Each structure stands twice: as structure tokens, then as C-alpha cells.
């Protein structure tokens, strides 16, 4: 109450920000007459003038009025479009490291030109971030003439571009690209083996379009660059055959472990758990299939990987639905983004889930992957010196933007008052009743000439509505992940009189729906349109535009509520742009996912009290409030998940930053010999300490163990025992010095053979490769630690603190391993003289010729012997990377002979 009274007196924070910025808008407007008098060349020269002023110490903030006035004037000359005052406000908000909430149709693309130009004056580069390649290319090409008129360069960063083209795009003053591509380029740059392979500059200013989609909806999705792991596709197929024998437990709230079914599903947490009956049955089936031995338990340590396969297969069958969570196209499982309804080509689920879905659908199972590098969008975008974003719907998530990204949200007023009519929700008992009511509403509105946009939350739902419309004989367009290519064209013409368009979530975001259709699209379809043809198209469009306005503008129908109010608002926001007429309504049923999981009991109770009959809908403020509360509950839960993910990822992020900084320093120097000499001392000190404890008696020395260790790990064959026998005065300190000196001399002899330059190059390569290999293993270990850390809570320990503590210990151990493995590899490298290499090469050629002759003979001999040979070869067991090495050293294969292969 007190806060409301204070807001009335002093205005809200938003009002105060806008009031301050309106003073600057007045200054910009006052400069307009002077700018209009400048010639084109004088206007262009302003860019060089601004840059010179910045170099002399002026700030960007002091340049805002003049720079914005220059961009506005250039836009009038190049596009014939003048920035509205509200767009100038939006530009200032974006320059202020804030998020600008600007309604659909208010010209966000043109608004972005203002802060992009201003921040590009520094010469450090501006990254404009969009949600897909189409929008990046469209916005770059649309704005290129304006920026080039002002002497700025524009680059487009698309996926699949070669490194030189990417480098050129990043070198431009203003670069357009997608969030994924910027993030992957950052990871790839930190895996480069030479400075020339890197493409990005220092991250300066990011201007994120559809910022809610990228920083909130995608925040839980890490960007991962992965390499192939061991092939286990056959196991996925075998386990997949077993799952259909299991029965789902009907009662969600019954005890997970003692229920009637074989597994229970927690839809809120998206988890699947086996019941005791299910565990018994699945163990029997695994034994029958020969996957597990009789008497073994699925939970025994030897069956951990098998348990992983069973869980993945259960989740694939119980939680993931075709045409909702993914589609199958050209024999490939492609993920569908739950927030936008778009397909995510190239993205794969982790933890074996994608392979389990491939097995379920009977398509080719691709190898599991091992993470080589990863980062979340939350941490990637926080690397920028300056970050800002714009969207039509940010206010509901303002707290999250502020707490995670330190970005304030400013709601920019519309250029014209909003007159869209948002009607109350209608709730039906069943899905079928709801669909029928939607069809009737569409019939009524299209008969009056009103265009209708139907928003669905999945491909499956969009196809259900489409089938019903076809039965009713209503012409319509379907816009979902399956028809991605025609997206912009369908959206542009969705405002035609009586047009019906079905769109999954907000496919088509970024393209305005023009009432009466898009006359520009019609002109673009003609090869060489004459001025008369263009005028006729415009006149026809004006007639259609007026007819649609008279019919009530664009009508939005939501087929169910989304988990987030923001995404519902995005759908509503497609109508009523720039002060146009429009209306919206959501149709719900008690069978909708949100209602079933979060709001069913309260709303069902209300419906029973009101005595609902089939086909009747309930429309009541109580119901709307109950639904809004359910959405808040989900939003709050999702925010907690994202915040928790960030807290855990922050631990990995600190380590990532340290490794990448170290790696970049390593890349930028050509000589790492000083570092090598320093870590050689550390490694030999630690190795000797393990066998000769400091300040210990000779009886405690393990000389044989030390000799063996030096021989195996550093290829140093030193007669330490003889030294001690022959030289009684040889004490611990001089012995240490002699061993280290021997190692240095051996290494120097190798260097003399190959030359200092070659050795420096080799040292740098070994350091980079070892660092990458250990970092990859560390990421996998961190992942395993993260998955099980919540169990520490049962021991009254804080899982987050435990995770921080253990991951730090693992990181420290990794750095020690890095030192050891680098010195070990460099010590063991064999250097050959040129004549030795030539002799070995000659021997290899002779051996190859002999084998070729033998193969020719074997082709003429009988096939049975060849088949037996093949059987013998294929019967050999493949040694896994983490298995003991067959040589008997006791080491893991990857650390022994596996390294040689």
C-alpha cells in the first residue's frame, strides 16, 4: 500500500528513467533542422569526426544526441523512414545496458541501428544477436545500406562459413549472427592450435534481439562441442526391445517403489522411476536377453552403464513424444524447441537420451559423444563488456534479468495507444469440446472477413487443429517446424481478409503481420514491376487493409496456456501492432498439460460446483486467477532451476576462464621453454619426494622404485644405486640435483638433433594437446560429480558447497597431471637422425610391397581360410580406454600403449 502511494507521488522507476531520457529526445529533435541542411558527404563525415572526438577523451554518452540525430537523418535519406521518439528512447535504453521492452510492430530492428552505430564508433565491434540465420541475414541486409552510408562495415556470421569468412565478419564494425554461432565460435577459438585459427575479437558489446528467448528460454541449454565416444548402439537396441513389456503406474501420487505398475512418471520434474515390481521384471528380461547374468542386480557397480541405458530408454518411451518433442525426418531424430516450435538441426540430447529415442524410432543410432568444450548462454553473454537486449515481453521476467544478468528492464511506451481487446479465457472439460469451440469461432470470424492466427504449443496439436479445419472445409496455412522454409512468407500474408494461419508457439517471430497482407511481398514476387503495377498493388492492399480493420483486425486464438505467461503474451502481441484494431482469446480444457499438472484440482472443483454440462465453457475471474497462479508456480520453479544451474555452472565457469586464459597465453607465445624448465623441476621434485621423502633416513629410500619410475615415465635409465654405493658422501640434495641435471642434459641432446626451433614448436604442441585431453576428461568427471552431488544432502551436507570443494580438488589434481604428462611425453619422445628415418622408411616400403604380394596370393586361395582369419580378428576384444593395459604395466590403456595408438 505504502509503495503504491509513493509510486503515485514520485512515479515508478520506469517513469523516472523515461522522464530523464525524454529530455535527451528533445535535444535530438532540436538538432533535426541542422542535420537536414547537411549534404550526404557532410553527414558521412560525422562518423570520422565522432571517432576522433572519442580518441581525444570524449565519452559515448556525450555523443548520444548528435550520433542519434545523424542516424535518424541517414535513415530518412536511405530508407525514407524517420525514427519515432519512442525508438530514440529504446535506443538510449539499449545503450544504457538495459533491456528494452518494445511491443510487436514498434520497429525494434530500426531501433537497434541507433545503439549499434554509437557503440561501433569505438572500433571494438558490435554483435547483434538473433534467434535464427534467416533473421540475422534479413536484418543485416536490410540495415547494410544505412550503415554503409555512414561509413560502417557490416558482417554476417552464419553457421558453416569457413574460418577466413568468419574472421572477416567479426572484423566488421557491426556483425549480425545467431546466439548459437557466437557461442560455438567462442568455444572453437578456445580449441584452436594457432592464433591464426581464432576468429573472434575481444567481446565488447552484444545487442540481443528476442532477449527473453535467448537468455531465459535457452538458458538451461548448454552449448556443447563434442567428439565421438565408444560405440554402444547395439545395447540401445537390445534395451529398447524390453521397455514395451513394462506397464506405467496409473496413480501418480502412489508410492514410487511399491505401486501396481512397473514405473512411475513425474511429469513436473520430467523424471521416470522404476517400482520394485518393475525392477524385478526388468532384471528377468535382461537375463532372458543375455544382457545380464543370472543372480546379478541391476544396481551392482558392474551394471552402472546398463542402468544408464535402461533409464535413457524409459525416458525416451515415457517422456518424449514424436511431433511434440522431436520429429523424424530423413531417418534422423531432430529436436523441436519447446519454446519456439522450431527444429534444432544439429542439436542432440545428452546422457544417451538421443540414442535411446533413435532406437525407439528404429532409425540409425549415432555414436554417443564426449564433451570437448561447453558453456551456457548465461555465462557466454556475461563475458561481454556491455550487454543489452530487446523484446516484446520482458516485464514478467524483469527480476530474473536483474538478478542473473544485472540488466534492468525498461518498458518503452508504444508510438500509438494499444486498442487490442483481450478477452477472458474459456475453459472446457475435454479437449474435443475445446477444439470444436475453436472451429466455430474461426468460422464466425472468417465469415466476417477477419483474419485469424491460431497458436498451438506443439506440432502434434497444430496438426489436430489443421485436420479439424480441413473437415470443416476452412482453407488455412500451417506454420510449424516441418515447414520452416516458408515461415516468413506465411506470416507476412497472415493478415489477409479471412486468412487462417496455424502457428506452433511463436514460429515466425521477427516478421510483422500486416493487416490486409504484405504489398511488399507481392511486389517482390514480380520480376520487373512497373510503377503502375506497384501503385495498383498498393491500392488493392489499402482496400483489403480497411476491410480487415472494419472486421475487427487480426484475431488471436490460443489453443492452450503455455507454462510461461510471457510466451502467451508474445502470441497476443501479434495483434494490435502500431495502434491497429485486434482481439485475442485463449481456449483451455481440463486435459491440457498445464491444467492437468498444476491447476486441475482447484479448477475441477469450481467446474463441478458450477454444474458444467458437455460443450459448456466456464468464463470466470476465479478460473483466470487460478490459471495465472499455476503459471506463476511454473515460472518460479523454472527460475529456481535456471538459477541453480547457474550456481553450479559458475564453479565450472571460473575453471573454464582460467584454462582458456592460460591456453590463449600459450597460443600467443612461440617459446614455452621457460615454462617447460619450470614445470620439469616441479615434476622431478614430486617424483623424487615420492620415493625419497625429504629429510629422511637412507633406510626409508625406495631407490629401486625410483629407478623404475624414472625409466618408465621419463625414459631415464640412471644407475642411482651404483652412484650411492660408489659415492658414500652423496647425500639427498646432491642426488636430487644430479637426477634433474641428467634429465636436462638428455633433453638438450635431443634438442641438438632436431634444432631449437623444431623443439619449441613440439613443446607448444604437446602442452596444448595434453591440456585439451585433460580438460576433456575433467569435464566428464565434473559432469558425473554434478549428477550425484544432491545425494550429499542426505548426509546433512550442502551439495553446492561440496560440489565447489570437490571440483576445486579435481581441478588442482588436473593441473598437477598436466605438468606430469607434458614432461613425461617430452622425455619419452624418440628423436631419429635423418639417415635412420630414411632406413626405416625404406624398410616400411619393402614390408608394404611384401604384404601386397601376399594379399594377391591369398585372393587366389580358398575363401574359407580367409573367413576363418576374419573371424579370428573380429573375435579379439577391443580394449577400452579406461581398461587395464594388456602389456601388464598395471596402468590404464589410455595412459600406456593407448597413447601410442
From Swiss-Prot:
Membrane-crossing segments per the record: none
Expression induction: Repressed under conditions of excess protein secretion capacity and derepressed when protein secretion becomes limiting. This is regulated by SecM.
EC number(s) per entry: 7.4.2.8
Cofactor names: Zn(2+)
Mode of membrane association: Peripheral membrane protein
GO biological process: intracellular protein transmembrane transport; protein import; protein targeting; protein transport by the Sec complex
Positions contributing to Zn(2+) binding: 885, 887, 896-897
Domain of life of the source: Bacteria
UniProt lineage: Bacteria, Pseudomonadati, Pseudomonadota, Gammaproteobacteria, Enterobacterales
Gene3D superfamilies (UniProt xref): Helical scaffold and wing domains of SecA (1.10.3060.10), P-loop containing nucleotide triphosphate hydrolases (3.40.50.300), SecA, preprotein cross-linking domain (3.90.1440.10)
UniProt subunit comment: Monomer and homodimer. Part of the essential Sec protein translocation apparatus which comprises SecA, SecYEG and auxiliary proteins SecDF-YajC and YidC.
Stretches the record annotates as Disordered: 852-901
Main location class: membrane
Organism: Klebsiella pneumoniae subsp. pneumoniae (strain ATCC 700721 / MGH 78578)
Cross-referenced CDD domains: DEXDc_SecA (cd17928), SF2_C_secA (cd18803)
One Gene Ontology molecular-function label: protein-exporting ATPase activity
Family designation: Belongs to the SecA family.
Protein name per its UniProtKB record: Protein translocase subunit SecA
EC category name: translocase
Amino acid at each position: 500500500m505504502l509503495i503504491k502511494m509513493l509510486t503515485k507521488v514520485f512515479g515508478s522507476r520506469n517513469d523516472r528513467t523515461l522522464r530523464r531520457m525524454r529530455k535527451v529526445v528533445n535535444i535530438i529533435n532540436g538538432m533535426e533542422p541542422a542535420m537536414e541542411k547537411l549534404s550526404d558527404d557532410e553527414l558521412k563525415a560525422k562518423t570520422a569526426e565522432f571517432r576522433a572526438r572519442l580518441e581525444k577523451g570524449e565519452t559515448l554518452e556525450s555523443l548520444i544526441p548528435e550520433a542519434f540525430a545523424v542516424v535518424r537523418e541517414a535513415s530518412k535519406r536511405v530508407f525514407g523512414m524517420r525514427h519515432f521518439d519512442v525508438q530514440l528512447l529504446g535506443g538510449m535504453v539499449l545503450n544504457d545496458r538495459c533491456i528494452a521492452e518494445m511491443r510487436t510492430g514498434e520497429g525494434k530492428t530500426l531501433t537497434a541501428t541507433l545503439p549499434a552505430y554509437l557503440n561501433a564508433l569505438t572500433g571494438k565491434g558490435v554483435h547483434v544477436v538473433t534467434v535464427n540465420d534467416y533473421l540475422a541475414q534479413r536484418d543485416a541486409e536490410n540495415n547494410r545500406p544505412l550503415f554503409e552510408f555512414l561509413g560502417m562495415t557490416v558482417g554476417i556470421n552464419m553457421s558453416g562459413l569457413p574460418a577466413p569468412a568468419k574472421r572477416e565478419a567479426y572484423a566488421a564494425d557491426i556483425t549480425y549472427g545467431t546466439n548459437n554461432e557466437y557461442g560455438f565460435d567462442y568455444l572453437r577459438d578456445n580449441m584452436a592450435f594457432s592464433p591464426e585459427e581464432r576468429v573472434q575479437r575481444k567481446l565488447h558489446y552484444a545487442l540481443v534481439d528476442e532477449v527473453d528467448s535467448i537468455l531465459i528460454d535457452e538458458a538451461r541449454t548448454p552449448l556443447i562441442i563434442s567428439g565421438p565416444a565408444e560405440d554402444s548402439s547395439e545395447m540401445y537396441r537390445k534395451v529398447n526391445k524390453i521397455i514395451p513389456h513394462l506397464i506405467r503406474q496409473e496413480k501418480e501420487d502412489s508410492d514410487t517403489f511399491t505401486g501396481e505398475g512397473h514405473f512411475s512418471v513425474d511429469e513436473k520434474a520430467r523424471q521416470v522411476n522404476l517400482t520394485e515390481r518393475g525392477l524385478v521384471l526388468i532384471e528377468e528380461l535382461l537375463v532372458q536377453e543375455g544382457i545380464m547374468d543370472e543372480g546379478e542386480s541391476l544396481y551392482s557397480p558392474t551394471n552402472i552403464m546398463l542402468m544408464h541405458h535402461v533409464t535413457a530408454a524409459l525416458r525416451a518411451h515415457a517422456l518424449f513424444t514424436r511431433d511434440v518433442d522431436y520429429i523424424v525426418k530423413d531417418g534422423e531424430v531432430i529436436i523441436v524447441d519447446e519454446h519456439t516450435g522450431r527444429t534444432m538441426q544439429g542439436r542432440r540430447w545428452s546422457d544417451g537420451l538421443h540414442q535411446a529415442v533413435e532406437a525407439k524410432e528404429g532409425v540409425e543410432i549415432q555414436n554417443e559423444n564426449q564433451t570437448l568444450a561447453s558453456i551456457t548462454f548465461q555465462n557466454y553473454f556475461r563475458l561481454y563488456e556491455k550487454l543489452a537486449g530487446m523484446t516484446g515481453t520482458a516485464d514478467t521476467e524483469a527480476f530474473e534479468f536483474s538478478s542473473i544478468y544485472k540488466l534492468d528492464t525498461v518498458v518503452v511506451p508504444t508510438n500509438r495507444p494499444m486498442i487490442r481487446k483481450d478477452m477472458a479465457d474459456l475453459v472446457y472439460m475435454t479437449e474435443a469440446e475445446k477444439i470444436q469451440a475453436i472451429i466455430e469461432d474461426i468460422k464466425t470470424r472468417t465469415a466476417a472477413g477477419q483474419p485469424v492466427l491460431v497458436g498451438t504449443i506443439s506440432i502434434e496439436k497444430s496438426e489436430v487443429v489443421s485436420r479439424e479445419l480441413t473437415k470443416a472445409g476452412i482453407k488455412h496455412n500451417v506454420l510449424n517446424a516441418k515447414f520452416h522454409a516458408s515461415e516468413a512468407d506465411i506470416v507476412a500474408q497472415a493478415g489477409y481478409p479471412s486468412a487462417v494461419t496455424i502457428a506452433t508457439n511463436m514460429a515466425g517471430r521477427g516478421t510483422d503481420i500486416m493487416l490486409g497482407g504484405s504489398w511488399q511481398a507481392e511486389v517482390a514476387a514480380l520480376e520487373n514491376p512497373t510503377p503502375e503495377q506497384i501503385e495498383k498493388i498498393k491500392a488493392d492492399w489499402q482496400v483489403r487493409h480497411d476491410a480487415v480493420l472494419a472486421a475487427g483486425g487480426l484475431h488471436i486464438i490460443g489453443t492452450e496456456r503455455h507454462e510461461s505467461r510471457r510466451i502467451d503474451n508474445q502470441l497476443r502481441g501479434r495483434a494490435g501492432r502500431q495502434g491497429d484494431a485486434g482481439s485475442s482469446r485463449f481456449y483451455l480444457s481440463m486435459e491440457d498439460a498445464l491444467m492437468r499438472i498444476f491447476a486441475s484440482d482447484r479448477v475441477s472443483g469450481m467446474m463441478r460446483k458450477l454444474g458444467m454440462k458437455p460443450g459448456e465453457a466456464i468464463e470466470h475471474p476465479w478460473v483466470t486467477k487460478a490459471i495465472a497462479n499455476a503459471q506463476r508456480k511454473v515460472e518460479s520453479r523454472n527460475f529456481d532451476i535456471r538459477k541453480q544451474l547457474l550456481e553450479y555452472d559458475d564453479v565450472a565457469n571460473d575453471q573454464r576462464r582460467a584454462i582458456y586464459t592460460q591456453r590463449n597465453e600459450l597460443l600467443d607465445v612461440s617459446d614455452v621453454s621457460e615454462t617447460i624448465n619450470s614445470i620439469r623441476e616441479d615434476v622431478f621434485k614430486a617424483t623424487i619426494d615420492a620415493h625419497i621423502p625429504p629429510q629422511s633416513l637412507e633406510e626409508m629410500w625406495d631407490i629401486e622404485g625410483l629407478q623404475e619410475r624414472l625409466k618408465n615415465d621419463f625414459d631415464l635409465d640412471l644407475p642411482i644405486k651404483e652412484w650411492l654405493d660408489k659415492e658414500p658422501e652423496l647425500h639427498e640434495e646432491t642426488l636430487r640435483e644430479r637426477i634433474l641435471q641428467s634429465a636436462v642434459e638428455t633433453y638438450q641432446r635431443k634438442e641438438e638433433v632436431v634444432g631449437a626451433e623444431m623443439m619449441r614448436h613440439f613443446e607448444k604442441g604437446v602442452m596444448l594437446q595434453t591440456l585439451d585431453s585433460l580438460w576433456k576428461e575433467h569435464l566428464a568427471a565434473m559432469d558425473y560429480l554434478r549428477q550425484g552431488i544432491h545425494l550429499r544432502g542426505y548426509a546433512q551436507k550442502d551439495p553446492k558447497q561440496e560440489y565447489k570443494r570437490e571440483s576445486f580438488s579435481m581441478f588442482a589434481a588436473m593441473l598437477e597431471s598436466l605438468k606430469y604428462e607434458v614432461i613425461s611425453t617430452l622425455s619419452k619422445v624418440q628423436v631419429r637422425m635423418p639417415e635412420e628415418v630414411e632406413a626405416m622408411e625404406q624398410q616400411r616400403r619393402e614390408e608394404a610391397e611384401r604384404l601386397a604380394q601376399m594379399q594377391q596370393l591369398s585372393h587366389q586361395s580358398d575363401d574359407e581360410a580367409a573367413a576363418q582369419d576374419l573371424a579370428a580378428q573380429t573375435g579379439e576384444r577391443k580394449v577400452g580406454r579406461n581398461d587395464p593395459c594388456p602389456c601388464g604395466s598395471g596402468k590404464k590403456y589410455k595412459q600406456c600403449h593407448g597413447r601410442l595408438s
